[in-house]
Structure formats: C-alpha cells, structure tokens
Amino acid sequence: MTNIRKTHPLIKIVNHSFIDLPAPSNISAWWNFGSLLGLCLAIQILTGLFLAMHYTSDTMTAFSSVTHICRDVNYGWLIRYMHANGASMFFICLFLHVGRGLYYGSYTYFETWNIGVILLFVVMATAFMGYVLPWGQMSFWGATVITNLLSAIPYIGTTLVEWIWGGFSVDKATLTRFFAFHFILPFIIAALVMVHLLFLHETGSNNPSGLISDSDKIPFHPYYTIKDILGVLLLILALMTLVLFSPDLLGDPDNYTPANPLSTPPHIKPEWYFLFAYAILRSIPNKLGGVLALVFSILILMLFPLLHLSKQRSMMFRPLSQCMFWILVADLFTLTWIGGQPVEYPFIIIGQLASILYFTIILLILPTVSLIENKLLKW
C-alpha cells in the first residue's frame, strides 16, 4: 500500500511543501525567518480573533473596550499585549527576511520576490489600521496625518481623503471601516503567503553561496523542521519576555490618553517599525515629493532584480558589496532613530542626508560596486 501522505490529494500538497520538499543542505539560520513569519501571522490572527470578540469599533466605546479587555476579560491583558508586541516581532522577522533576500540575491526569483514586496505593503497597511483601533491620541492623530498624505495626489487628492474618512475628519465611519479592513487583510495576507510559497517551490530555495544546489538536496523533514522548531522556541521566548516583563516598551504613552480631536500631541510619530519610512517622508519639504519618496522607499525593493549587475548571485564572496550592504543597514537604523526625533536642527539635516544615502546606495553605489567586483574577478 502506498503511503497516504503521498497519495491523498490534500495531504500530498502538504507533503510536497513541508515534508518531502528537497532543500539545499547548506541554508543557514537566515532561512528560518519564513517559518517564523508564518508563526507570527498565526499568532496575530488567533489573538486578533479573540480581541475582536470583545472590541467595539465605535468612537465612544473603542478606548473603553480595550481597557475592558485588559481589566475584565480572562487573560485579556495577555491577548492584547501578545497582539501588540506580536506585530513588532512580525516586523523584526520581516526586515530580517528581506535583508536576507537582499544579501544572498534571493530577489532573482522575481515572482517570489515581487509577491513578497506586495506582502510587505499589505502587512504595513494592516499594522497601520490596527494601530488606529485602540482610539488613543496617537491612534487618532496618526490616522489623521497618514491618511491626509493622500491629499497630495493632484486633482483627486482631497476627494479621495474624504472618501476614505467617510466624512470631513477621522471619525466613527473611519474607525468602523479600519476595523473591517484590519480584520479581513490578515486572511488576504495568508492567501498571498500561499502564492509566495507556490512560486518559491517552483524554483526551490536559494542558499548562502548563491550557487545552484540541485546536486546536493536533503529532505525538509526532519532536518529543517527541527531547525525551524528551534527558531520558533526562540521567537516565543523573545515575544513572551517582552509581553510579560515590559509590554509597553515599544508603545507610545500618548496612546493611553483617549483620542481628542481638540488637542494635538507634541510629537506625532508612528510605531517604531514605520519610523525609517516616516523619516524619509519628513526629509522632503514638499508634500507630494515626500509621499512619493515614502512609497518609493519600499517600492524600490522591486527594482533590485533589475539593478543586479554582478556575475555572482550572493554577496558571500563580494566584500565590497558586503561593505555597502552593512552601510545601508546602518543608514536604516539612523533613519529609524531620526523618525522618532522632533523636527529641528540637527535632526532635519541628518534625516535628509540619511534619506539621500539610502536611495544613492541602492540605485547607484551597489550596482557600480558590482561592476567593479566583476572587473576584479579578472584581475
């Protein structure tokens, strides 16, 4: 009798994706983040579902309902903080996953890569709308500032913003629709993840050397299932340490004040994982220019397959490119720091220089350095 694992129409798909999948023998811990992102998504959907059972999307009661979850619901505080800090973990894994793709040239699988970039956009949109739901001061003003950016679009901008708001300001209609979208988007993300994996399994995984590894494959189970379990345990340890010891470490104290349209907080800033993009947005004095720079700062990832001029796929054997890559990482840390600072000297100029450097490294320096390394191969 043939194994049901290999014959059953449904189990067969799971088998080819997670059990008998041929995987390169040399993929490092940097390849763990895909499974960790899957875990993060599962945690977010489950905790989010239980939060939605007690949350009310009405401006009068939203803030109180979140307080009620934390005080009166059994382990409500745990669910709420796991969801809030789970988002931070999600983005840490996302950034590391994208960084791995850039370093090892995984973007040459361009269908997989482009769906990944779309996933990044959708996750960012979901996180933004989720931040609005507790209806604290930063929720309200963050929503006002970010949605207002769309008014920079010529001709239709103002109409578009009022259409998204459902009125003439961020109000009850906005909160209700944001809740609806925040609920549905994670399921759309899950569907996109399946497409992401579908395209990945067409080509097979990349590996640190960037060389074709067809001649040296090992089964995913047990080798990488056990390796993934280690990553999962470490992620849960990090998440629960954050949730149980300092749940508000990454949050904004202003969000413990109920939303008040008549009082603007001194410093409006998004969650930490959006600060790098926020810094790029603020570094351009023109509104439309800022919005375009903001969108392009993420969209630029789609250009990487076109900007890859090196004869080698991975950066493993390219010291100059490695150097530029880590300067880019340092630049992103700088942008994140600047995004959380007030708009004054010297932060304005540092932000502008860091923004220019970000685009220059990606569009100009990395391709140029790749060409130099190609020449050095013959030297």
Curated annotation (Swiss-Prot):
Residues annotated to bind a ubiquinone: H201
Cofactor binding note of this UniProt entry: Binds 2 heme b groups non-covalently.
Transmembrane segments annotated in the record for this chain: 33-53, 77-98, 113-133, 178-198, 226-246, 288-308, 320-340, 347-367
GO cellular component terms, semicolon-separated: mitochondrial inner membrane; respiratory chain complex III
Main location: mitochondrion
Binding site for heme b b566: H97, H196
GO terms under biological process: mitochondrial electron transport, ubiquinol to cytochrome c
Positions bound to heme b b562: H83, H182
Domain of life: Eukaryota
Record's signal peptide: none
Anything else known: Heme 1 (or BL or b562) is low-potential and absorbs at about 562 nm, and heme 2 (or BH or b566) is high-potential and absorbs at about 566 nm.
Family under the similarity heading: Belongs to the cytochrome b family.
Assembly description: The cytochrome bc1 complex contains 11 subunits: 3 respiratory subunits (MT-CYB, CYC1 and UQCRFS1), 2 core proteins (UQCRC1 and UQCRC2) and 6 low-molecular weight proteins (UQCRH/QCR6, UQCRB/QCR7, UQCRQ/QCR8, UQCR10/QCR9, UQCR11/QCR10 and a cleavage product of UQCRFS1). This cytochrome bc1 complex then forms a dimer.
Name of the featured protein: Cytochrome b
Gene designation per UniProt: MT-CYB
